[in-house]
Amino acid sequence: MNKTAAEAIALANEVAQLVKAEVSADVQVIMAPPSLFIYEVNKAVSGISNLAVSAQNCHEKSSGAYTGEISANMLASSGISYVILGHSERRQYFAESNTQLAAKVDAALAAGLTPIFCCGESLDLREGGEFLAYVAQQLTESLFHLSAEDFAKVVIAYEPIWAIGTGLTASSDQAQEMHAYLRGHLATKYGQNAADNCSILYGGSCNAKNAQELFACADVDGGLIGGASLVAADFITIATSF
């Protein structure tokens, strides 16, 4: 939860100008404001082919008596293209399960949105040597019911929870190891070609200082940016790090 309405629109306008001036046309930039500001932010960035807007979450039902919730259909009707699902904070604070996230993925796809599906492990799981199986299970239980056609519409974001706000940092070697493993696991279900074509983003405290090294990894296709996205100049530095 960051930015007031005025601050969010100002940030969107600044990012839009910087994307037009500095970011290569083949680099896709996505902003994910709070749902309250999506419509205005989307208007602010409209007309820029490589700048899009995402929601941070959606409900798994298309409509109904779920006070305070927002459906994928409602998000799509606002003109956006993406929705983040399964973010580590949603899993931690709202107890979102793999089963629930499978339903959210289905809802997003049915509404024509591209899901950015997040997965990742805690420090305990990493230190216990259970992290590979844990993250594989997240993918299997939330995505492997999809047809090959629908899977091709999904973006994956790996979040090493142990490297977010802990003072610890994942090395580029650790990031590459996990991304290669995730791609290999996806290939067991959908084949190597489909896995190779899947965008896998890195979301563990990626910032202006480490983005270039991380993005140089063979299996890191981009970043899911947190705090660094709140400052336009830092965000654009990351976007120009490819």
Protein language model regions, located:
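Active-site loop-to-helix "anion-binding N-cap" substructures in soluble metabolic enzymes
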Residues: 1-157, 161-242
